[in-house]
Protein backbone atom coordinates (compact mmCIF):
# COMPACT_ATOMS: atom_id res chain seq x y z
CA UNK A 1 0.00 0.00 0.00
CA UNK A 2 1.15 3.46 -0.80
CA UNK A 3 1.83 5.61 2.26
CA UNK A 4 1.12 9.32 2.38
CA UNK A 5 3.86 11.88 2.99
CA UNK A 6 3.13 11.51 6.72
CA UNK A 7 3.74 7.75 6.56
CA UNK A 8 0.07 6.83 6.98
CA UNK A 9 -2.20 4.77 4.78
CA UNK A 10 -5.20 6.98 5.64
CA UNK A 11 -5.28 10.57 6.82
CA UNK A 12 -6.78 11.47 10.18
CA UNK A 13 -9.69 13.09 8.33
CA UNK A 14 -10.48 9.88 6.44
CA UNK A 15 -10.18 7.76 9.59
CA UNK A 16 -12.55 10.12 11.45
CA UNK A 17 -14.99 10.09 8.54
CA UNK A 18 -14.83 6.29 8.37
CA UNK A 19 -15.55 5.99 12.09
CA UNK A 20 -18.56 8.31 11.76
CA UNK A 21 -20.00 6.43 8.78
CA UNK A 22 -19.48 3.03 10.44
CA UNK A 23 -21.12 4.37 13.61
CA UNK A 24 -24.08 5.74 11.63
CA UNK A 25 -24.49 2.43 9.78
CA UNK A 26 -24.40 0.59 13.11
CA UNK A 27 -27.07 2.85 14.63
CA UNK A 28 -29.27 2.38 11.55
CA UNK A 29 -28.79 -1.40 11.81
CA UNK A 30 -30.57 -1.29 15.17
CA UNK A 31 -33.69 0.17 13.53
CA UNK A 32 -35.13 -3.07 12.25
CA UNK A 33 -38.22 -3.36 10.12
CA UNK A 34 -37.98 -7.16 10.11
CA UNK A 35 -35.51 -9.72 11.52
CA UNK A 36 -34.94 -13.32 10.50
CA UNK A 37 -34.17 -16.10 13.02
CA UNK A 38 -30.70 -17.12 11.75
CA UNK A 39 -29.52 -13.57 11.15
CA UNK A 40 -30.32 -11.02 8.52
CA UNK A 41 -32.79 -8.18 8.70
CA UNK A 42 -34.40 -5.34 6.85
CA UNK A 43 -33.20 -2.14 8.47
CA UNK A 44 -33.49 1.62 8.13
CA UNK A 45 -31.03 1.60 5.20
CA UNK A 46 -28.01 0.62 7.30
CA UNK A 47 -25.87 -0.10 4.22
CA UNK A 48 -26.25 3.43 2.83
CA UNK A 49 -23.54 5.13 4.94
CA UNK A 50 -20.99 2.46 3.98
CA UNK A 51 -21.97 2.57 0.31
CA UNK A 52 -21.89 6.37 0.34
CA UNK A 53 -18.42 6.38 1.91
CA UNK A 54 -17.18 3.90 -0.71
CA UNK A 55 -18.56 6.09 -3.50
CA UNK A 56 -17.11 9.20 -1.87
CA UNK A 57 -13.62 7.93 -1.06
CA UNK A 58 -13.06 5.07 -3.49
CA UNK A 59 -12.41 1.35 -3.17
CA UNK A 60 -9.51 1.39 -0.70
CA UNK A 61 -11.44 3.34 1.94
CA UNK A 62 -14.72 1.65 0.96
CA UNK A 63 -13.40 -1.89 1.34
CA UNK A 64 -11.66 -0.98 4.61
CA UNK A 65 -14.73 0.72 6.11
CA UNK A 66 -17.10 -2.01 4.96
CA UNK A 67 -14.87 -4.71 6.46
CA UNK A 68 -14.68 -2.79 9.75
CA UNK A 69 -18.47 -2.47 9.67
CA UNK A 70 -18.71 -6.25 9.24
CA UNK A 71 -16.51 -6.77 12.29
CA UNK A 72 -18.63 -4.31 14.29
CA UNK A 73 -21.76 -6.25 13.25
CA UNK A 74 -20.08 -9.45 14.44
CA UNK A 75 -19.45 -7.86 17.83
CA UNK A 76 -22.90 -6.31 18.32
CA UNK A 77 -25.14 -9.00 16.75
CA UNK A 78 -23.21 -12.25 16.38
CA UNK A 79 -24.67 -15.35 14.77
CA UNK A 80 -21.88 -17.90 15.02
CA UNK A 81 -21.90 -21.53 13.88
CA UNK A 82 -18.43 -22.01 12.42
CA UNK A 83 -15.22 -19.93 12.11
CA UNK A 84 -15.39 -19.96 8.29
CA UNK A 85 -19.05 -18.95 8.43
CA UNK A 86 -18.07 -16.01 10.65
CA UNK A 87 -15.55 -14.85 8.03
CA UNK A 88 -18.06 -15.22 5.18
CA UNK A 89 -20.99 -13.59 6.98
CA UNK A 90 -19.18 -10.66 8.53
CA UNK A 91 -15.88 -9.25 7.19
CA UNK A 92 -16.25 -10.78 3.70
CA UNK A 93 -19.99 -10.16 3.14
CA UNK A 94 -20.04 -6.64 4.54
CA UNK A 95 -16.59 -5.92 3.13
CA UNK A 96 -17.91 -6.52 -0.37
CA UNK A 97 -20.13 -3.46 0.01
CA UNK A 98 -16.91 -1.50 -0.51
CA UNK A 99 -16.83 -2.70 -4.13
CA UNK A 100 -19.14 0.26 -4.80
CA UNK A 101 -16.06 2.46 -4.53
CA UNK A 102 -14.78 1.17 -7.87
CA UNK A 103 -17.79 2.82 -9.53
CA UNK A 104 -17.70 6.44 -8.36
CA UNK A 105 -18.95 7.59 -11.76
CA UNK A 106 -21.75 5.01 -11.86
CA UNK A 107 -23.06 4.94 -8.29
CA UNK A 108 -26.14 2.81 -8.91
CA UNK A 109 -24.07 0.13 -10.64
CA UNK A 110 -21.51 0.22 -7.82
CA UNK A 111 -24.17 -0.02 -5.13
CA UNK A 112 -25.89 -2.88 -6.96
CA UNK A 113 -22.62 -4.80 -7.32
CA UNK A 114 -21.65 -4.21 -3.69
CA UNK A 115 -25.00 -5.50 -2.45
CA UNK A 116 -24.84 -8.43 -4.89
CA UNK A 117 -21.39 -9.30 -3.54
CA UNK A 118 -22.76 -9.25 -0.01
CA UNK A 119 -25.62 -11.52 -1.12
CA UNK A 120 -23.24 -14.09 -2.64
CA UNK A 121 -21.12 -14.27 0.53
CA UNK A 122 -24.23 -14.82 2.69
CA UNK A 123 -25.62 -17.24 0.09
CA UNK A 124 -22.46 -19.37 0.16
CA UNK A 125 -22.45 -19.35 3.95
CA UNK A 126 -26.10 -20.37 3.93
CA UNK A 127 -25.54 -23.28 1.56
CA UNK A 128 -22.55 -24.61 3.48
CA UNK A 129 -23.33 -23.80 7.12
CA UNK A 130 -27.09 -23.23 7.43
CA UNK A 131 -28.35 -26.14 5.29
CA UNK A 132 -29.67 -27.87 8.42
CA UNK A 133 -32.23 -25.08 8.80
CA UNK A 134 -33.74 -25.79 5.38
CA UNK A 135 -37.21 -27.34 5.62
CA UNK A 136 -37.37 -30.99 4.66
CA UNK A 137 -37.46 -31.41 0.90
CA UNK A 138 -36.01 -27.94 0.18
CA UNK A 139 -32.53 -28.02 -1.34
CA UNK A 140 -30.00 -25.92 0.64
CA UNK A 141 -29.20 -23.84 -2.47
CA UNK A 142 -32.86 -22.86 -2.88
CA UNK A 143 -33.24 -22.27 0.86
CA UNK A 144 -30.18 -20.03 1.04
CA UNK A 145 -31.14 -18.08 -2.09
CA UNK A 146 -34.67 -17.42 -0.80
CA UNK A 147 -33.59 -16.73 2.79
CA UNK A 148 -30.77 -14.33 1.95
CA UNK A 149 -32.34 -12.93 -1.19
CA UNK A 150 -35.59 -12.21 0.61
CA UNK A 151 -34.21 -9.66 3.03
CA UNK A 152 -31.25 -8.42 0.96
CA UNK A 153 -33.44 -7.70 -2.07
CA UNK A 154 -35.66 -5.41 0.00
CA UNK A 155 -32.71 -3.89 1.87
CA UNK A 156 -30.96 -3.44 -1.47
CA UNK A 157 -33.93 -1.71 -3.09
CA UNK A 158 -34.15 0.67 -0.13
CA UNK A 159 -30.42 1.41 -0.33
CA UNK A 160 -30.38 1.85 -4.10
CA UNK A 161 -33.36 4.20 -3.91
CA UNK A 162 -31.73 6.35 -1.23
CA UNK A 163 -28.43 6.49 -3.14
CA UNK A 164 -30.45 7.41 -6.25
CA UNK A 165 -32.11 10.27 -4.33
CA UNK A 166 -28.72 11.44 -3.04
CA UNK A 167 -27.34 11.30 -6.58
CA UNK A 168 -30.36 13.03 -8.15
CA UNK A 169 -30.24 15.83 -5.58
CA UNK A 170 -26.51 16.24 -6.27
CA UNK A 171 -25.69 15.55 -2.60
CA UNK A 172 -23.29 12.78 -3.65
CA UNK A 173 -21.41 15.21 -5.91
CA UNK A 174 -21.24 17.92 -3.22
CA UNK A 175 -19.49 15.58 -0.81
CA UNK A 176 -17.15 13.83 -3.26
Regions found by a protein language model. Name each.
Residues 47, 89-97, 119, 155-160:
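Core segments of transmembrane alpha-helices
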Residues 28-42, 68-101, 126-135:
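Interfacial aromatic-anchored transmembrane helix boundaries in multi-pass membrane proteins
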Residues 55-57, 99-104, 166-171:
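Structural signal for the C-terminal ends of transmembrane alpha-helices
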Residues 1-22, 108, 142-176:
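Alpha-helical transmembrane segments and their cytosolic interface
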Residues 15-20, 48, 59-67, 86-87, ...:
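Hydrophobic alpha-helical transmembrane segments
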Residues 25, 29, 122, 126-130, ...:
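Juxtamembrane/transmembrane-helix interface segments of polytopic membrane transporters
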Residues 103-120:
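Internal alpha-helical transmembrane segments of multi-pass membrane proteins
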Residues 1-55, 60-64:
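Hydrophobic transmembrane alpha-helices
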